[in-house]
A protein has these predicted regions:
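C-terminal partner/receptor-binding element of secreted or periplasmic proteins
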Residues: 142-188
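Terminal, regulation- and interaction-focused segments at domain boundaries
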Residues: 27, 31, 35-73, 78-86, ...
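N-terminal signal-anchor/signal peptide hydrophobic helix marking the start
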Residues: 21-26
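Generic structural motif
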Residues: 56, 101-103, 130, 142
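N-terminal Lys/Arg-rich, disordered targeting/topogenic segments
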Residues: 1-18
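Flexible, solvent-exposed short loops/turns enriched in glycine
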Residues: 116-120, 124-156
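Ser/Thr-rich, low-complexity intrinsically disordered terminal regions
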Residues: 47, 63-126, 151, 159-163
């Protein structure tokens, strides 16, 4: 039997500063890329909000925007001339401007973004029919835009415009439903 000899442990060579710096930079780049992709996907799916109203049609909403906007709300509606082509399947597409001068003034008076926010005054509401025939109302997600811009724009967009536009759209839908129910009752 051979005597046991003592073996020297393998020498561990410390890595140089270049390896640590390269790993750090790679981590920063990978993190930034992941953050950018996540932000892009989040905005893509959340920048437009849509409400579907089964039993109601886009044409009924079009009439409601034209005839039933409550004057005391401070909101004005006007049909938006749009050069967009109709959907290829022939569905109706209506575009409306739904604006409130008080909120528009609040955006224009923003000390940080007042010169550019008037271009973004989020007024356009689009109405079309889903494949099943129900009305789909879409608009910019003003709450999200408020978070992105911050400051006075956040207050105006998130706390003012967003909840009031949602309430007005729901009010129009309720009015259409009531009108349809009354017509049905009056039919012989």
């Amino acid at each position: 039997m051979e005597p046991l000899t003592e073996q020297k442990p393998a020498q561990i060579r410390p890595r140089g500063k270049n390896h640590v710096l390269a790993a750090f930079l790679l981590g920063v780049i990978a993190g930034a890329a992941a953050m950018f992709c996540t932000g892009f996907l989040y905005l893509r799916h959340n920048l437009i909000v849509s409400y579907e109203f089964p039993g109601l049609t886009a044409a009924e909403f079009d009439d409601a925007f034209e005839n039933a906007m409550p004057a005391e709300s401070g909101w004005k509606s006007s049909r938006e001339a749009c050069s967009l082509p109709l959907p290829s399947d022939g569905r109706a597409l209506y575009n409306w401007k739904l604006c409130n001068r008080t909120y528009a003034r609040g955006l224009m008076d923003d000390p940080d973004h007042g010169l550019v926010l008037p271009a973004l005054v989020p007024c356009t509401v689009s109405v079309t029919n889903a494949p099943d025939g129900s009305a789909v109302v879409s608009r910019l997600n003003t709450s999200l835009l408020g978070v992105i811009y911050g400051g006075n724009a956040r207050r105006v967009l998130r706390s003012g415009i967003a909840p009031e536009q949602e309430a007005l759209i729901s009010l129009l839908a309720d009015g259409i439903r009531k009108e349809k129910a009354q017509r049905k009752e009056n039919e012989p």
